[in-house]
Amino acid sequence: MTQKTKRTLALGLAAAAGVTLLAGLDARLVVRTYAIESEQVSTPVRLAVLTDLHACAYGEGQKNLLDVVAVQSPDLVLLCGDIVDDDPRMPEERALATVEALAEVWPVYYVTGNHEFWTGRVEEVRELLRARGAVVLEGESAAVTAAGQTLRIGGIDDPSVGEDIWREQLETVTAAQDGETFSILLTHRPERVEDYTGRGFDLVLAGHAHGGQWRIPGLINGLIAPNQGLFPQYAGGAYDLGGGTAMIVSRGLARESTQVPRLFNRPEVVVLDILPS
């Protein structure tokens, strides 16, 4: 192989590596769509699930994010925690404005994540979100009508609330189910699956894992996630927990708030269609 050929090959490999890296660092929003069939609904219901915003920016007035949600025409918007951030560099008002804009169009239901607790002002954050139109669930269950269908949405705080309180909240929302209405558990933590199984929920929605931060599609679903460590089992996607319970874990919306950039792991809006079986 001549020196010129070696140089050409090296340049080609470097260019290919650069293109691959740029593709991997793509931080544009993506929509992940899932569908669940149920005998408990007679017409489709569409949910938009947003997690782990961490007060990140999505255009002026959060237009990029809001437009993506609007195009999906959801019946409900569900927020699974870490919408605000404890880092003072991430403006809380941006997160609050996002929730307010969502609540002006759709019913919005919210539970806390660990970062709301890490602000040291979790009760104030809850009240600020209520003032912006979100229904804040802290161990409570609500019968919600959407697209002419009744759903039961139970929401629990992040375990940062304290383990005893967290378990009491979980027991409360479990007991609120009637066995006939499609039931959803809103939680922040996907790794607590053993606590969610066998409770009769049709659907568990969670975030927190940020998609494992780095992904290699087709090889690893995530490199590392909080409270799961290396190669997390519940980094993002759909999971069958058995007993008729499905879990959807959103890879979340965090971008500039993270210390390590996402790799092959675009921030996402989850759209879930509940369809008549």
Regions found by a protein language model. Name each.
Residues 43-137:
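Membrane-embedded segments
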Residues 75-76, 109, 134-135, 151, ...:
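Short, Asp-centered acidic motifs that coordinate Mg2+ and/or phosphate
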Residues 190-270:
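Conserved beta-sheet core of the metallophosphoesterase superfamily
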Residues 35-48, 141-155, 178-182, 240-247, ...:
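Beta-strand-turn-beta hairpins that frame and shape the catalytic cleft
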Residues 127, 131-134, 146-187, 193-194, ...:
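Binuclear metal-dependent hydrolase catalytic cores centered on His/Asp/Glu-rich metal-binding motifs
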Residues 1-41:
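N-terminal membrane-anchoring alpha-helices
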Residues 26, 53-58, 85-89, 159-163, ...:
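Short, flexible loop segments at the rims of nucleotide/cofactor-binding pockets, characterized by
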Residues 50-55, 81-83, 114-116, 140-141, ...:
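Active-site metal-binding loops of divalent metal-dependent hydrolases
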